[in-house]
Amino acid sequence: MKFGELYMNGGAVVIDGTRRQLLPDHWVNHARTVVANDAVTETQYGAHWWVWPQCENSLVATGYEGQYTVVIPEKQLVMVRLGKTDTSLRPAVMHQLQQIALKVTNL
């Protein structure tokens, strides 16, 4: 969650009421710079993050055994999905997360 919040806040955290920039502010934007497309999942890859083209400015981290962190800064949203998922079910889990993200971004 904290990792997602770091990116949601443009690379900054608030400690004792003081905003501190931990990452250069341009780095978060760089993370969204698409360097590859995945035609199977209809996602794009940036700098160490996946990007969902249908959710503008999203950042998505995929982790071990089907864990996900989804960041949509404009909606102040960080979704974290912890749980073990069989490989065959992961596309369905990702699709469900995308549907949630789309509903939130269209509010």
Please tell me what each predicted stretch does:
Residues 1-33:
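Active-site-proximal binding-pocket segments
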Residues 1-13, 67-83:
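Active-site-proximal alpha-helical segments within enzyme catalytic domains
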Residues 19, 23, 41, 93:
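Short acidic-hydrophobic sequence patches enriched in Asp/Glu that either
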Residues 19-20, 32, 81, 90, ...:
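Arginine residue identity/basic-tract feature
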Residues 25-78:
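Active-site Gly/Thr loop motif
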Residues 85-87:
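A short acidic/small-residue loop/turn micro-motif
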Residues 90-107:
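Short, gly/Ser/Thr-rich active-site loops of penicillin-recognizing serine hydrolases
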